[in-house]
């Protein structure tokens, strides 16, 4: 929690104003932030200075794992995070590749689970990673990536957190996640949960011990219409104790995640928090 608040304060104190063409808004911006989560010790990085909806963040990551490309599918598993980008982004509404209401196009897991090969066909990056890790293999390239510049024009949004690199030392699994851009007031509390969850669940289904997760953000920013709430409300609140994430131990395979897992398979203990803050969302 401290590292999150330190980053927020750093942006407020040291950030530079940058005009964002996509949203038409100014962003207070810093370059490079590194956060670390001790997954092995169960230190769940859920924001306490406002109410955070961790199940929506986990649902979104499970949607990526399943390769979803439709906002309706994300809604069915418990998150509405793709509604606006699918249906209110004018550039996407005008895009000939859009297939209709709720279509997101080639986003995140749709790319990562079907990464195109230059000679035809595709690679299921995640299935390869899970197979290797279960068999004690780390080829120093166990990377689940969503980043394909050749497909950007075929999706409603380029991936923000675009790469998840797993590493195995002895029987302990580590994760390095890289994020090109981060809306810190709205997105980071989700992204922290997702990095933690991804390492925790992959360690569980591969039979490994979870170690540390390392989260690199390149462009960290606060939008101009979020600044007052962050500076004058959230940063004035005292952080509370760290909760614990409980994952159903019956989840034992990638197939389980793809088929029967629901948000009922996840819960938290000891989550005390301040009231919610409704930050503006920029499409």
From Swiss-Prot:
Enzyme class: transferase
Biological processes annotated in GO: dTMP biosynthetic process; dTTP biosynthetic process; methylation
PROSITE patterns cross-referenced by the UniProt entry: THYMIDYLATE_SYNTHASE (PS00091)
Pathway listed: Pyrimidine metabolism; dTTP biosynthesis
Alphabetized Gene3D superfamilies for the sequence: Thymidylate synthase/dCMP hydroxymethylase domain
Major location category of this protein: cytoplasm
Leader peptide range in chain numbering: none
Catalytic activity: dUMP + (6R)-5,10-methylene-5,6,7,8-tetrahydrofolate = 7,8-dihydrofolate + dTMP
Catalytic residues of the enzyme: 160
Family: Belongs to the thymidylate synthase family. Bacterial-type ThyA subfamily.
Protein name: Thymidylate synthase
Species whose genome carries this gene: Pseudoalteromonas atlantica (strain T6c / ATCC BAA-1087)
